[in-house]
Regions:
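Contiguous, often N-terminal, cationic amphipathic patches that form binding interfaces
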Residues: 1-64, 74-77, 81-85, 94-126
Length: 126
């Protein structure tokens, strides 16, 4: 479980990350199973990173969606300390996610996080 201070809760926060990932400063990258959106903001400098999950009904029924959220939450809770302060991350599950071994998801998540954080960091200077 992610601590409350590390969770995105408001829909406006989710929208800002998803919008920001397409614009200046933000970044997104995806695999067959997940898409990771990152939006570092100066307004949140010095505050802990926050994470949000988006798992739509296209992924499966409620049982499947909740399991997907539990797995993604557990993977992110062990990686939250690696994220820089002031960064908001949204992980969007794709329809191929159910049934994917956790080890593969962990590998994809690590690779995608490294990619989007590197891109977001290089765009901040511009």
């Amino acid at each position: 479980m992610l601590p409350a201070r590390h969770r995105l809760r408001r829909s406006s926060d989710f929208a800002a990350v998803l919008r920001g990932a397409r614009g200046a400063g933000g970044s997104r990258s995806g695999s067959r199973f997940i898409v990771v959106h990152v939006n570092p903001t100066d307004a949140r400098a010095g505050q802990p990173p926050r994470v949000g999950l988006v798992v739509s009904k296209a992924v499966g029924n409620a049982v499947v969606r909740n399991r997907a959220k539990r797995v993604l939450r557990a993977l992110m809770s062990s990686r939250i300390s690696q994220l820089p302060d002031g960064v908001d991350v949204v992980i969007r599950a794709k329809t191929d996610l159910p049934g994917t071994p956790t080890a593969i998801l962990a590998h994809d998540l690590d690779k995608l996080l490294a990619t989007v954080l590197r891109r977001a960091g290089s765009q901040e200077g511009h």
